UniProtKB/Swiss-Prot annotation:
Haploinsufficiency of KCTD11 may be a cause of development of medulloblastoma (MDB). MDB is a malignant, invasive embryonal tumor of the cerebellum with a preferential manifestation in children. An allelic deletion involving genes from chromosome region 17p11.2-pter, sometimes restricted to 17p13.2-13.3, occurs in up to 50% of MDB. InterPro entries: KCTD11/21_C, SKP1/BTB/POZ_sf, T1-type_BTB. Residues 1-49 form the BTB domain. This is BTB/POZ domain-containing protein KCTD11.
Length: 232
């Protein structure tokens, strides 16, 4: 296994690839794996402050049978205990831009009719100082990559639900796309501001935040367009 490759005196079979020249190729990469390689090189566990993927790192270490790394992870977790949530701020706001879209609808073999429908485009801006919570929000909305630079607390989304009157071909031609949430088997479309902010509220509460302010009407959460959460 991987640990044996870095230990002297461990017999290893020769490379079966005649062009390999006796070198081994490690077919693995990722944020967790870099810490495994650092541990094997340096002989110590050196994780960045606030590292929150020890469970994934432990699973990788167990898969590769790196017992010293497993022991180091156990010592780290025992020394840390249950970490207390750190103070953080989460702000989410949504704007909607309606527009009238005109298109030709086919009503018969040689009969076309000019139709129009309103399409609402939603733009959501999220700001969160807790990177773990921000990552959970991205995962909740199925965003694998986006315009959020590495380490930035900002996250932006834009989507436009398709009205039933608008043909799918016209919807695609306009370059519009829906927004979905939920896991496999329970996916549901985010059709407007209330459903989007409801998902944000769920994630915020799961990460220890509490609702601090509602805009524009503090008494009307369901029809709000901006929410602010804090965690002390």
């Amino acid at each position: 296994m991987l640990g044996a490759m870095f230990r002297a005196g461990t017999p290893m079979p020769p490379n079966l690839n005649s062009q390999g020249g006796g070198h081994y190729f490690i077919d693995r990469d990722g944020k967790a794996f870099r810490h495994i390689l650092n541990f094997l090189r340096l002989g110590r566990l050196d994780l960045p402050r606030g590292y929150g993927e020890t469970a994934l790192l432990r699973a990788e270490a167990d898969f590769y049978q790196i017992r010293p790394l497993l022991d180091a992870l156990r010592e780290l977790e025992a020394s840390q205990g249950t970490p207390a949530p750190t103070a953080a701020l989460l702000h989410a706001d949504v704007d909607v831009s309606p527009r009238l879209v005109h298109f030709s609808a086919r009503r018969g073999p040689h009969h076309y009719e000019l139709s129009s429908v309103q399409v609402d485009t939603f733009r959501a801006n999220l700001f969160c100082t807790d990177s773990e919570c921000l990552g959970a929000l991205r995962a909740r909305f199925g965003v694998a990559s986006g315009d959020r630079a590495e380490g930035s607390p900002h996250f932006h989304l834009e989507w436009a639900p398709r009205p039933v009157e608008l043909p799918e071909v016209e919807y695609g031609r306009l370059g519009l796309q829906p927004l979905w949430t939920g896991g496999p088997g329970e996916r549901r479309e985010v059709v407007g501001t209330p459903s989007f902010l409801e998902e944000v509220l769920r994630v915020a509460l799961e990460h220890g935040f509490r609702l601090d302010s509602v805009f524009p009407d503090p008494e009307d959460l369901l029809n709000s367009r901006s929410l602010r959460f804090v965690r002390h």
